[in-house]
Amino acid sequence: MMKKLFTLLICISSLLLGFTSCGDEAFDVDSVNRQTLLVFMPWSGSSNTASLYENLRANVDSMCAGIKAQKGLKNARVLVFMSRNSQESNLFELKYDDSKKVVVRDTLKKYTDGAFYNSAEGMASLINEVKQQAEALNYAMIIGCHGCGWTYAADWVNYPYHARPNLGGTSSNYDYWGSIQFGDDPDHPKSRFFGSVSLDDAKIDIATLAEGIKQSGIKMQYILFDACYMGNVETAYELKDATNFLIASSSEVMSIGMPYKTIWSSLISTAPSYSGIVSGSVNFYAKSDAPYCNLAAIDCRQMDKLASIMKEINASYTLHSSIPLDSIQPLGGFRPNIFYDLGVYVDSLKPSGYLKEQFTAQLKATVKAAQSTEKVASYIFVNQGEEIRVKSYSGLSISDPSQNSVAIKGREKTGWWKATH
């Protein structure tokens, strides 16, 4: 028996040695592409207006500056999908030329079939193209465009006009805020609603994005939404099977977007610094002439647990009629408000000690990093902007208490509502 066991151990050892020395050359672990970052910048305008196009181009320039500051990309690759107009888009790679100390843009593929990405199949085909061009151990995604949280564009009837502030009077400064952009007809917005399924070909539903990522067979390490109002429980819950982390703002985002050069080292690392991304972005704006920004990093893998506790709370508690809605921290400028701070809302429900402790602990586990300036701003209704003081910011908003007709019509269709009621 001992002889048989000894012989078996020798065979196993030989087999393992064979696996580790089957080639003449040793496997170079450092040569593996560890992360591919897809920067997704779909068309944000209409057939005859460019909207955020110049801002998005400036964002790519800022990324290039970050790459130069880091003297390259090391074990990472960056592919950018950018729409030039409503029909044409390019997929190109940012490459660092070490000899010239510059970042070059290598075009990989040109698209002339419009907004093919507005379906799950189209989104999956784009991600699969990225995988084919730059296979990696991990994938992450930055999405730069307009946004209006989880809401469905089909539920809007009369849109508010969006007036952009004129900061300095130049045309470049005039397009300063990355919120909702509307044309002369308030029933036909030219902005991008993540949540739209029927407004026009340039709209993408959050569920469509999530399904497209899942169809590609990967799960993102993180998704950074450089867009307004995407930091909400409804969106985070919808993306829980598509990404590990969601980085997003619960309020309006300036059209100049995230300070990519400043936060680049935190973004491109194989172990991203979520606290670095959040603090770097908020501190950048806090020191600027327009000190309005909040941002949070959400662990979407914790969303099921958060929903489970929220369901227990909703089963026993409702918002008392004596509590005014304006006492719950607003994070947006819609009238009536759509986006309320999640932590303050739950406090307003006044759950029992046990449930409150459970919720607080789970919220802390879900929100890995969150930071806000003292105020955020909204330019939806007011040409010169209106400031919203932020006394409390948990890192996520919720639309459960909203009396806005869009929220009332749409929230029960969300996965979050179904999981918590």
Give the predicted meaning of each segment.
Residues S83-D106, I143-S196:
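Surface-exposed loop and adjacent secondary-structure segments within mature catalytic domains
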